[in-house]
Regions:
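Conserved N-terminal glycine/acidic-rich loop preference
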Residues: 1-13, 37-55, 103, 118-153, ...
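FAD-site-proximal beta/loop scaffold in flavoenzymes
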Residues: 118-140, 221-226, 230-291, 298
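FAD-binding core/adjacent interface of flavoenzyme oxidoreductases
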Residues: 1-3, 69-143, 228
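Beta1-alpha1 glycine-rich phosphate/pyrophosphate-binding loop at the start
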Residues: 1-71, 155-183, 228
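Internal hydrophobic alpha-helix adjacent to the cofactor/substrate pocket in enzyme cavities
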Residues: 17, 287-314
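A Rossmann-like FAD-binding core segment of flavoenzymes
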Residues: 71-79, 95, 163-256
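Short hydrophobic core segments
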Residues: 7, 35, 95-108, 214, ...
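C-terminal auxiliary extensions adjacent to catalytic cores
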Residues: 325-386
Length: 386
């Protein structure tokens, strides 16, 4: 009997699981096991909302898997033996596999700058976001530093400022927030942040995080009652330790079909994968993660049928950014994620962003119910492909 094991139930891992669940249901020659530390699904697209004190729905992975033949195992993966084809859990259980889907994702890089791990908050989980929310309520007034001008930093700063108008929210960034957008969308983004009272300071480097603020490279100290670290991510060292070929950031290098180039029985999806397209490497987002999960699952099904796996091709569509609950900016993009001349802002953008944030769970349900959905087309290089 073939045993397919998926480690990690983020956006990409859940997509692979849901796709496989429908395709192998009722088969007595295939087992599918999903391993994840928590039974609760982490909506990373909404963690900035949780950080500001909003309650999120508690989506349960076992509920999603109900009615399928997928086995859910709760536990932390602490070791991988790629040659023996086994994964080890924190309770010393060992699970063997014939095919592995590696979907361990990424977390905030708290090791690159001194003090981050000790004194900064992160958005790695709903629990982490809840800790920051409690601290913001405790502060009452004061300054909150959000480090990082990417999508997570922008959305977090906006959400905190809207929910806590008594706080002075400072967004510190090496680059201009919204630098990936076109000039009109970027100007609209900055106007939205200014309306909420967010102070932007770009072109700065944080060299140390302290209990009461952050130190910049030029010697300035920015006082803060709380610091949210939203710049830079790192992947699990498990892959490198197991001997899988990885790039300089520790991501597993894949072939065109999303298999590890060093271990063809390992498919890699989401943030943990170094997937190359014609325009360069795919960067880790939910937008690209779900397609990698669906495609890897489809290729596994093809291999079960004795067919060759297909090449993965993908192009980006948009950069959706919420600015609190009442404003948003959507930058539409070319397939390589560069900004097009089209963007959306205001209430229609709010509705668009909410649809994007809510779509993964619905997508998993549809993948579980409708086999044909796994053959959806992903945008690529000005065209579409299966």
């Amino acid at each position: 009997m073939k045993h397919i094991v998926i480690i990690g139930a983020g956006y990409a891992g859940m997509a692979a699981t849901a796709r496989l669940a429908r395709r192998v249901k009722g088969r007595d020659d295939v087992r599918v096991t999903l391993v994840n530390p928590q039974a609760r699904f982490t909506e990373r697209l909404r963690l900035h909302q949780a950080a500001s004190g909003q309650r999120l729905a508690e989506l349960q992975i076992p509920d999603m898997l109900a009615g399928t033949d997928v086995e859910f195992v709760q536990g932390w993966v602490t070791g991988l033996d790629a040659d023996a084809r086994t994964v080890r859990l924190d309770d010393e259980r060992v699970i063997g596999y014939d095919t592995l889907v590696y979907a361990l994702g990424s977390v905030a890089d708290t090791e690159a700058v001194p003090g981050v791990d000790e004194f900064a908050y992160t958005l790695n989980s709903a629990h982490d976001a809840g800790l920051l929310a409690q601290e913001l309520d405790r502060l009452g007034a004061g300054t909150v530093v959000v480090a990082g001008g990417g999508l997570t930093g922008i959305e977090s700063a906006a959400e905190i400022a809207e929910r806590h108008p008594e706080l002075d929210v400072v967004l510190l960034s090496r680059q201009t927030p919204g630098s990936m957008m076109g000039p009109k969308a970027r100007a609209r983004l900055h106007a939205g942040l200014a309306r909420l009272g967010v102070r932007i300071r770009s072109g700065v480097d944080i060299v140390k995080v302290m209990p009461d603020g952050v130190a910049l490279a030029d010697g300035e100290v920015v006082p803060a009652g709380a610091v949210l670290w939203a710049t830079g991510v790192r992947v699990s060292p498990l892959a490198a330790a197991a001997g899988l070929r990885v790039d300089e950031r520790g991501r597993i290098i894949t072939d065109a079909a999303l298999r590890s180039v060093s271990h063809r029985d390992v498919y890699v999806v989401g943030d943990a994968a170094a997937v190359r397209q014609g325009y360069g490497l795919v960067h880790g987002t939910c937008q690209s993660g779900i397609p990698t999960g669906v495609h890897a699952a489809a290729n596994i099904v093809r291999e079960l049928k004795g067919k060759q796996p297909k090449r993965f091709r993908f192009g980006y569509v948009h950069q959706p950014v919420s600015l609190g609950r009442h404003d948003a900016v959507i930058q539409f993009t070319h397939p390589d994620d560069s900004a097009s001349r089209f963007y959306l802002a205001g209430r229609w953008a709010v509705a668009y962003k909410e649809t994007v944030s809510a779509s993964p769970w619905t997508t998993y349900r549809l993948l579980k119910l409708l086999p044909a959905l796994g053959a959806v087309t992903w945008r690529r290089g000005g065209g579409f492909t299966r």
